[in-house]
């Protein structure tokens, strides 16, 4: 390894190790069931949400209890189920477009790591409309609050509902963009075994 690069890497590691306790990590607040999601959105006066998921989750009707709870509270739901494994820039842009066109006020990420990453990146693009995902690659390149983001994980293991990371793939070049920013940590999560 190039000695200058090695010194840079070691310095970066040292600085991050020292700074880590002072960085603004937060744990998502846990919501109590699907009714807790509806109550939160009602309290925040949000009348429509974007539900980001995938076709597999939708085909098993896993989103129905949440959809019914939101409908019962008078909250409209726009469903983006085009997320694929290793979400692409095109997925993110389609979700972002749906959010804006339908006048949504929050994003619910429902599913595994791919749905979470797609929702986080769509939120980042909504927060930074003039900044493409390719320029958000790396550490702390979003630096703006996202729309309200609620994570509903359906898998155990990815931990995307608590992380500051999202990985998006460029469908043409197959380059993966790791986006790491504290703004990507969802402020709320629903951990419901049902």
Placement of each model-derived feature along the sequence:
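An N-terminal, well-structured beta->alpha segment
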Residues: 1-79
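Local beta-strand N-terminus motif with an aromatic residue
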Residues: 46-48, 104, 186
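Conserved beta-strand elements of the Class I
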Residues: 50-51, 106-108, 150
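Short strand-loop junctions, especially beta-strand C-caps/beta-turns
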Residues: 54, 82-83, 194
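N-terminal small/polar loop signature for handling phosphorylated ligands or for N-terminal nucleophile
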Residues: 58-130
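A glycine/threonine-rich phosphate-anchoring loop and its flanking beta-alpha core
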Residues: 127-194
């Amino acid at each position: 390894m190039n000695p200058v690069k090695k010194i840079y890497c070691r310095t970066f590691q040292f600085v991050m190790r020292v700074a880590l306790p002072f960085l603004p990590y937060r744990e998502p607040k846990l919501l109590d069931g699907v009714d807790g999601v509806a109550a939160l959105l009602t309290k925040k006066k949000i009348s429509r949400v974007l539900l980001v998921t995938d076709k597999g989750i939708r085909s098993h009707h896993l989103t129905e209890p949440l959809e019914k709870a939101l409908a019962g509270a008078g909250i409209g739901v726009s469903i983006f189920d085009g997320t694929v494994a290793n979400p692409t820039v095109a997925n993110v842009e389609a979700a972002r477009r749906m959010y804006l066109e339908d006048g949504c006020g929050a994003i619910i990420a429902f599913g595994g790591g791919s749905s979470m990453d797609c929702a986080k990146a769509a939120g980042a693009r909504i927060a930074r409309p003039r900044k493409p995902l390719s320029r958000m690659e790396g550490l702390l390149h979003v630096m703006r609050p996202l729309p309200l983001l609620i994570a509903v994980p359906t898998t155990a293991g990815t931990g995307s509902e608590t992380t500051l990371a999202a990985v998006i793939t460029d469908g043409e070049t197959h380059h993966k963009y790791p986006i790491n920013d504290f703004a990507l940590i969802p402020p709320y999560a629903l951990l419901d075994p049902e």
